[in-house]
């Protein structure tokens, strides 16, 4: 059995100050952040690493909450004794983003000004707002700086924003399978997912009861999103053109294996994620542009003062390699130390979760060059 961080607990911290959002609105206090930590702080509190999660992730990145848990945290392959993010060396933190439903303040939370759940009265948030909330946690933990901020997909956006927003705090950033701004195609896919939810009569304009969510709409919305995480090659390998039951081939409702998989994946998602949180995070993804409130991407990226390590995946069509390459090229033209590794993989956008062994040695080498 591989080394593990063992049994872990999700913690919660409430912050008393309101949070001014990029929209200009205030997110009212108390603002809760759910987080987990792995490993121990060193004497001068200089060994902290922040892990940032993707769209439907949470703070539970490694270990298990109980011995009976079927699966460990979502990045357990990466975090633990002797692993890439070595908990014998680093103090690793992962927090749930605001706007989500994993314990941090989001649309399911109680609005302190009304005493009722926010639902759609929750303000629209941006990735930059998520990062500002995370900075409060890092300050609460009394970490003067971070060795790195590392994450994939939406986590890569957060890592990049850390470099732009808090250049004096981060000593490096590692964006994986990310982009500098969300493309029209990615926005279009999210629009379809939204419409699937809006067309479910149980959605009730976001005022559904938790025990009666818009299950059909959320399942379909998730399935639409999930397709973009895969690739043509991985779907051929996993499903081919196989039917789930041969005698259903000429049954009008007979299913290919890929159909059954999408249906199962969507239905399983209902039990672990809130619909409004799904919508709010999709909106945050759509709005993402590192140049927001700057005159250009160059002006935003010139704020980064630390080395960066970038990974893309050849079959990722959600955030194609060229999108991250554009950011790396700008950084290098600005004289910033930006290291880039395009990874050959057939697993699409999810390659960073499926085949970490293809890029982790680069992370180890990169971290070894940094001072802890």
UniProtKB/Swiss-Prot annotation:
Task: Give one Pfam family.
Answer: Abhydrolase_1
**Keyword terms:** Acyltransferase, Amino-acid biosynthesis, Cytoplasm, Methionine biosynthesis, Transferase
Enzyme class comes to transferase
Residues annotated as binding substrate: 222, 350
Q: Tell me the active site.
A: 153, 316, 349
Q: What is its main location?
A: cytoplasm
Choose any GO biological process term that the UniProt entry carries and state it.
homoserine metabolic process
List, alphabetically, the InterPro entries matched.
AB_hydrolase_1, AB_hydrolase_fold, HAT_MetX-like
Looking at the record, the residues that make up the AB hydrolase-1 domain are 49-356
**Annotated EC:** 2.3.1.31
Its UniProt entry gives the catalysed reaction(s) as: L-homoserine + acetyl-CoA = O-acetyl-L-homoserine + CoA
A GO cellular component annotation here is: cytoplasm
What's a single GO MF annotation on this record? homoserine O-acetyltransferase activity
What is its pathway?
Answer: Amino-acid biosynthesis; L-methionine biosynthesis via de novo pathway; O-acetyl-L-homoserine from L-homoserine: step 1/1
Localization terms from the record: Cytoplasm
Q: Look up the coiled coil feature and give its residue ranges.
A: none
Q: Which proteins does it associate with, and in what oligomeric form?
A: Homodimer.
* PANTHER family given in the database record: HOMOSERINE O-ACETYLTRANSFERASE
What's this protein's function? Transfers an acetyl group from acetyl-CoA to L-homoserine, forming acetyl-L-homoserine.
Q: Spell out the family assignment given in the record's similarity comment.
A: Belongs to the AB hydrolase superfamily. MetX family.
What's the protein called, per UniProt? Homoserine O-acetyltransferase
